[in-house]
Structure formats: structure tokens, C-alpha cells
């Protein structure tokens, strides 16, 4: 029992030092600016994280836009939910299903190009505070879009606009351009045990 006060004092000293370091970093950080965030990797949670940021942005009263490049054959929970707020979210489902479902490369390219035209409109609009480009990485990975054009459009967006790009296999150039990159890893997934996608979890 006698060492409890000492432990508490040591803990307090550590936390004070940590706070001082964090406070200094915040004070020395540049002004606010629009961020490019890339969520990639084979694990679950990329789109879920993006839509969490969408909800957070809406909570701050921001105007937002969403373009889904691959998903589209079936309505997802996020689409059904965010479409309830048309005055705040422009939600575009432009895909025609996963690539193994369509089995038509030219059709996939046409769908991706149409989706990018919608994306460019959002990326040029300074009133839009957050743009989610869901599964854009997949479209780029399969060569459905011109990578240089995509990167150029992202760089030319309004200075305070945030963009979240999701999908496996993010291109090295996209990672280089991004401000924040998160790679989702797989430790265990229900699908490996033969459990199909569930409403409210994957759908």
C-alpha cells in the first residue's frame, strides 16, 4: 500500500511530460487544411471508417459528397441511411457490382469514367467539405481510370476540402500524395468460416 502514492506521482509526472510534448506539437502544427486520407489493405473496415468520417462531418454541419465506384448492385445500409439527408449529402452509387460479377471490362471502364466525372464535380465545389470516393483504389488498380488525371484532380480541389479514398491495393502514387494512410489488416474474418455478409456489418 505504501508505494501507491509514489506510483500515482510517477504516473502524473509521465502524463504531464506527455501533455507538454503533445501541446507543443499542436502549437507548431500548420494551419488547418483539406486532407487526403487513404484507407487500404485487405482487412474489413475501410468503407466503414470512411462513412464514420462522413457522419462526423455532417455533425459539424458540413456539406458532403459520396461516390461509390464498385458497389451498386444491392443497396447498402450506408446508402439507405445517408440518403435520408439529401440536403447535406450528395450520394452517388455509380458502380454495377464487383468486378467478378460484371465480367465485362469495357462496361466497368465506362462506369468508372462516369463515376469520375461526378467525382470531379464534387472536387471542384468549394461548398463541399468532405468527399468520400469509395473503392476508387479498386478502379485504379484495374486500370479503369487514368491515374495521372485522378491525382491531378485531387491536387486541384479546394484547399479546405477533405477527401477519403478507400479500397484495396492503393497505388504508390496515391499513397505518396495522401496526408494520412491507413492499411487495414486481416487477423480473422467470418467469411473464412463460411459466414456470408451480414446486414449492418458488411451490408
Regions found by a protein language model. Name each.
Residues 37-124:
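Conserved P-loop
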Residues 69, 135-136:
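Generic detector of well-ordered alpha-helical packing
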Residues 30, 39-41, 57, 163, ...:
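Short glycine- and Lys/Arg-enriched binding-loop motifs that mark or flank ligand-binding interfaces
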Residues 1-35:
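Extreme N-terminal, non-catalytic leader segments
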Residues 33-34, 61-62, 127-128, 159-160:
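Short coil/turn connectors at secondary-structure junctions
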Residues 19-22, 113-116, 163-166:
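Short gly/ser/thr-rich secondary-structure transition/capping motifs
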